[in-house]
Amino acid sequence: EQTYKDWTYDTALKNVRQAAAIDPLPVYTQLEGDILFAQQDYAGALAAYEKVNASNLASAASFFSAAKTKELLKADAKEVIALMDSCVAHCPQPVTADFAPYLLERAQLYMNNDQARNAMLDYDAYYKAVNGQVNDLFYYYREQAALKARQYQRALDDIVKAIELSP
């Protein structure tokens, strides 16, 4: 396989901007955001993702990209959670296994922001989305959410299941 020796993020950015100048499709803006993100230009990436999210190309993935970028920019947690809410809202309902990782990501965000009950709901939705095909770590994380939410019996049940799967 032949690789391009002179290919860089800057070259890719220049090319995608030229393409957007010819035909300003949202897919080019998404790609520009991804390149800027890879270059760690998070402010530029966020601006691109926000344009995509205001277009007909808005998707769970584009809102997720915006949420992760805002998180890296140390934005207020409420803003990041709002973007993750939009991410999950753009998933097919009921959420399928392909989109289930977004639920785990939001559950972790909820846990980091003392919203254990909301985290439990996302863990439960994840469990449903993957038809119960989960591992010991899942049960441990859901147990932690249940414990913080003062759902002690659920917490006990989940930690027992985690230990069963990984003694």
Language-model regions, residue ranges each:
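Start-of-helix register in tetratricopeptide repeats
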Residues: 25-28, 61, 97, 101, ...
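Register position in tetratricopeptide repeats
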Residues: 5, 38, 72-73, 112, ...
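TPR-repeat structural position
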Residues: 9, 42, 76-77, 116, ...
